[in-house]
Amino acid sequence: MKKLVLLFALVLLGFQVQADSIQNTDEETKTEEQPGEEDQAVSVSFGDPEGTSLQEESLRDLVCYCRSRGCKGRERMNGTCRKGHLLYTLCCR
């Protein structure tokens, strides 16, 4: 039952993120992105610090943010992040 509630919450969060991103599309094209309190930079790395065959050049430069209102501009949704009991959208570029 708890899994069903969690799954339902994630589905609702996905719908909310899509709705917010559609509403904010016009605003995002007019204003330049400024990191705020709601955005947190996340460094993503795969494998050893020296690099492995799994770590490609494009993955080394991946910058991700935990956003509460959906991804901006050239970012793509790559999952979710959690801060305390709140879930955020993981947006990477």
From Swiss-Prot:
Major subcellular site = secreted
Q: Alphabetically list the UniProt keywords.
A: Antibiotic, Antimicrobial, Defensin, Disulfide bond, Secreted, Signal
UniProt-listed InterPro entries: Alpha-defensin, Alpha-defensin_C, Alpha-defensin_N, Beta/alpha-defensin_C
The leader peptide range reads: 1-19
Q: Which residues form the propeptide?
A: 20-58
Tissue specificity as recorded in UniProt: Paneth cells of the small bowel.
Q: Give the location in the cell.
A: Secreted
What does the similarity note say? Belongs to the alpha-defensin family.
What protein am I looking at? Alpha-defensin 1
Q: Which species is listed as the source? A: Mus musculus (Mouse)
At the highest ranks, the source species' classification is: Eukaryota, Metazoa, Chordata, Craniata, Vertebrata
What is the gene name? Defa1
